[in-house]
Amino acid sequence: MLILGIDTATAQVSVAVGGHEGVLASTQSVRGRQHAETLVPSIQFVCKQARVELSEISVVAVDLGPGLFTGLRVGVAAAKAMAHALRVPMIGVSSLDLVAFPLRFSSKLIVAAVDARRGELFTAFYRQVPGGIQRLTPHHVVSPDDLSSELLATAEECVLVGDGAVRYREVFEGLHKVEIIEEGLAYPAASSLVMLAHAQALREQWVKPWDLQPLYLRKPDAEINWQTRQDEP
């Protein structure tokens, strides 16, 4: 089984290929919002590095968000098109799950925080379990100050990870028992996507391309701006 993982939910574009033998090749780049221009060359690069032909891919996995609306649309649309063309199933994974996954060996409460722009964060809480992580809360949207209050209320050691944690570091760095993970793990990675998708694929927990939808949690900024203008006197 070979899985192609595509992640464009944040400022970073990440692509990976892997399967039973683990991750065979991966790449990530941050080029502003040039997701469409970066994605195809990234797919070509990892396939070449892994010595894999696209026709050998048996599952396409994609980051469903939450994250940047434009990036999500690019990644999900491309993943759907590839799965349809290759006639293979798909697996979708949350960006917050992907951000939390590299910390699966931590005994602390894991808090993933992805920058939602507009002074807000997409967040969820996780705990280490045998073989990975378990989400303890629904995905939700909060302000940095509200998340800070949530962390204070837990009264246990926490590890805070994600580009939202990095952006609003000054809000969290004074909190007792809260460790902020540095920028190296700030973005979801397609390598984590491949590993999580592989576990789901073994359980045949996949979906048809037309059934897979992005996880937005909030209206697009363009729609919010339009509604704001309509509400003005």
Task: Give the location of each predicted region.
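N-terminal beta-alpha supersecondary unit
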Residues: 1-66, 187
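Surface "functional belts" at beta-alpha junctions
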Residues: 22, 34, 89-188, 202, ...
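Stable alpha-helical structural segments in soluble proteins, enriched in small hydrophobic residues
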Residues: 46-50, 85, 103, 190-201
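Generic secondary-structure signature for well-ordered alpha-helical cores
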Residues: 48, 52, 152, 199-206, ...
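Phosphate-handling active-site elements
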Residues: 48-55, 83-95
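Flexible, glycine/charged-enriched surface loops at secondary-structure junctions
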Residues: 57, 206-209
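DPxDG-like acidic metal-binding loop motif
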Residues: 61-90
